[in-house]
Amino acid sequence: MKVSEVIEGFVKGREGMSSSVSARWDVDGLALYSYNVCVAFWHGGAIHLTTEKYTATTSSHCNKVKEFARKENIRLDSFDPPHVRRRHIGR
């Protein structure tokens, strides 16, 4: 799959995988990973997007999430990675 297809699928609640991005279910629900770092997840009817800055590519992935979420009228919230989903991002 292309990166944009994985991200669009994530926003629509589907799993998918490309070389750098994956959307997969874990114990807390559907999450989006960029290079194995959780950058977004579904919770309470909203997509929670990381506030952490990683690489230009990961920022591009996050911007795509915002773009697709706005098209679908899905609420966006943010999360601070050191405090949320700690076991999923290796901290």
Feature locations, PLM:
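Terminal leader/tail segments of proteins
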Residues: 1-91
